[in-house]
Design a protein with these regions (language model features):
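Short, conserved structural patches
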Residues: 2-3, 52, 56-141
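Alpha-helical assembly-interface signal, strongest on the long, hydrophobic N-terminal helix that forms
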Residues: 2-76
Length: 141
């Protein structure tokens, strides 16, 4: 009787070890995958907020291209968004600056951000290829 109980107990321990060996990597992948997705959402939202806020600055009558560029880059730096490119365009006059813009002209702020510089996974799996782009449009006041 005792011999049977010992065998059953050690078989259960072996089963638990095998289950943990299978489930633990899945749980780790799930946790790190969730962290990666949340970080990418945060970076994208930060870039969108920077584009929107820069567009708000651009709509003011007293602002110029340098003010808008500086404001967008400051917001991106504060949110730790790396290697972002900000472009400012007067869509109505088809110019890449907002100097000499008139009331009612459409302004576009575009922010391009590479994934590789802004995610944790590039330390593990190498440089993440690709980038994303966000845009904000407003009319000059």
């Amino acid at each position: 009787m005792r011999h049977t109980q010992r065998r059953t107990r050690s078989a259960r321990r072996g089963t638990a070890t095998v289950e943990m060996a299978i489930v633990l990597p899945v749980l780790i992948a799930l946790v790190f995958g969730s962290i990666e997705i949340c970080q990418r959402l945060h970076v994208k939202q930060s870039a969108l907020i920077a584009a929107y806020e820069a567009c708000r600055v651009a709509t003011r009558p007293i602002s110029d291209t340098a003010d808008v560029q500086t404001h967008a880059e400051t917001l991106l730096t504060q949110q730790d968004v790396k290697q972002a490119t900000v472009s400012i365009r007067n869509m109505t006059q088809a110019k890449n600056n907002i100097n000499n813009i008139v009331t009612g002209d459409e302004i576009r702020i575009r922010v391009d951000v590479p994934w590789g510089a802004n995610t944790v996974s590039h330390y593990v799996i190498g440089d993440s290829a690709g980038s994303f782009r966000v845009e904000a449009f407003m009319l000059r006041e």
